Structures are given as C-alpha cells and as structure tokens.
Curated annotation (Swiss-Prot):
Upper classification of the organism: Eukaryota, Metazoa, Chordata, Craniata, Vertebrata
Chain spans, region Disordered: 1-171
Modified residue annotations for Symmetric dimethylarginine: R107
Species the sequence originates in: Sus scrofa
Entry-annotated residues carrying Omega-N-methylarginine: R42, R48, R107
GO BP term, pick one: myelination
InterPro entries: Myelin_BP
Annotated localization: Myelin membrane
Family in the record: Belongs to the myelin basic protein family.
KW Cell membrane (keyword) present: yes
Name of the protein in its database record: Myelin basic protein
UniProt GO cellular component terms: cell periphery; compact myelin; internode region of axon; neuronal cell body; plasma membrane; protein-containing complex
Membrane topology note: Peripheral membrane protein
Length: 171
C-alpha cells in the first residue's frame, strides 16, 4: 500500500482529468456510476494522504485536483440521480388525480408531506389553501381521510375551487 500511494500522488493530475473524462462519457450509465463512486473514494483517499506528506505546493495541487475531480463528477452523478426522484415526485403528485381515493390512501399521508414542501414554495397557493382546509379536517372524526380527500381535490381543481368547496361540503 505504501508503494502505491506516491505513484497515485504523482499521477493525481492525470487521474483527475482521466476520471472526469471517463465520467463525462460514461456518467449516465448506471453501471459506471458505482465504479465512479469507487474510484472517487480511492481518489479522495489518495489525495487525503498526499497533502499531509507532500510539500505546500503538492497540497495545493491535490486540493485543486480534488475540486476539479469532484465537481464534474458530482454534476454527472447528481443529475441522473436527482432527476429520478424529481420525476417520481411529479408522477406521485399527478397520479392521485386518476386512481380512486382507496388507492391514494396509502400515498395520501406521504403525499401530504411532499405537497406541503412543494406548495410551500408557492406561499400564497400552499398556505392560503392548506391552513384553513387542514384545521377543519383535523377537527372531524375522519382526520386522515379528510386530509387525503382535500388533498386530492386541491390537486384536481388547482386549489381555488376546492378551497371554497370542501369546507362547505364538510359542514
């Protein structure tokens, strides 16, 4: 192991450019994502040892190469991985429109958590619509069902109609 480290340190400049080039080409393939993370760990491990042993110049170089290596790789890895949850997130929001509430019940609770976060970004929409709706829903005996029902209605009608409609229908 001690023999490998200096060679890796000397080659860190080439390692950085080679690994980022590889990831630019293969970053989107899931097979390479795992190996990329492995090489990233090895890469960081080698660089962690280098600044301690090496001179000040070497330390600077290692720090620079890690940044150069980590940023493009994180962008390459982050995009496909971030895209999927986002896509799933929107699919989860859209799906309650079509299936019956019985199917949405399981999702209803988790969806309500997500929708709070999503609608919290549009304060007028989310808080204006949610806060009045949720208080009467919790007062009722069917707390979870009410919350889920108002949720699906808000998504179906876009919030405005369900806000005026659901509390009156409940009462």
């Amino acid at each position: 192991a001690s023999q490998k480290r200096p060679s890796q340190r000397h080659g860190s400049k080439y390692l950085a450019s080679a690994s980022t080039m590889d990831h630019a080409r293969h970053g989107f393939l899931p097979r390479h994502r795992d190996t990329g993370i492995d090489s990233l760990g090895r890469f960081f491990g080698a660089d962690r040892g280098a600044p301690k042993r090496g001179s000040g110049k070497d330390g600077h170089h290692a720090a620079r190469t890690t940044h150069y290596g980590s940023l493009p790789q994180k962008a390459q890895h982050g995009r496909p991985q971030d895209e999927n949850p986002v896509v799933h997130f929107f699919k989860n929001i859209v799906t309650p429109r079509t299936p019956p509430p019985s199917q949405g019940k399981g999702r209803g609770l988790s969806l309500s958590r997500f929708s709070w976060g999503a609608e919290g970004q549009k304060p007028g929409f989310g808080y204006g619509g949610r806060a009045p709706d949720y208080k009467p829903a919790h007062k009722g005996l069917k707390g979870a069902q009410d919350a889920q029902g108002t949720l699906s209605k808000i998504f179906k009608l876009g919030g405005r109609d369900s806000r005026s409609g659901s509390p009156m229908a409940r009462r």
